[in-house]
Regions:
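Phosphate-binding glycine-rich loops and adjacent basic patches that engage nucleotide phosphates
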Residues: 2, 37-45, 65-73
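Extracytoplasmic electron-transfer domains, predominantly the class I c-type cytochrome c fold
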Residues: 59-113
Length: 115
């Protein structure tokens, strides 16, 4: 019985480590900044505050990526938003337009904005 509990504890710890910020940690924030400036800053603004020139014309306004609300989102949630968009907002999905690596890089950069 103790062996089963030990195995379950090891599996739970492994799952916690594996499900952590792997996408952000695996991404390159410097590369992500370049992708962000090219594809995201028009709406989200140069510092990710949701105040880009195109974003000013949108309703609802683009997310402030430096906010506590964004910081509370899991990496998986943010990655899904980047990949699939966020209806009914103007946020489009970037899967197919950006590689998985570029999406990971953007996620790492977005995470760096809230620090």
């Amino acid at each position: 019985m103790k062996q089963v509990k030990w195995i379950l504890a090891v599996l739970a710890m492994s799952a916690a480590v594996w499900s952590g910020p792997a996408w952000a940690a695996g991404g390159d924030a410097a590369k992500g900044r370049t992708v962000f400036e090219k594809h995201c800053a028009a709406c989200h603004g140069p510092q990710g505050k949701g105040d880009g020139p195109t974003g000013a014309m949108l309703t609802p306004k683009p997310a402030d990526l430096t906010s506590a609300g964004t910081a509370k989102k899991s990496d998986a949630d943010l990655r899904t938003i980047i990949e699939k968009g966020k209806p009914p907002s103007a946020m489009i999905g970037w899967k197919g337009q950006l590689s998985d690596g570029e999406i990971g890089d953007v996620l790492a950069y977005v995470r760096s904005l809230g620090k």
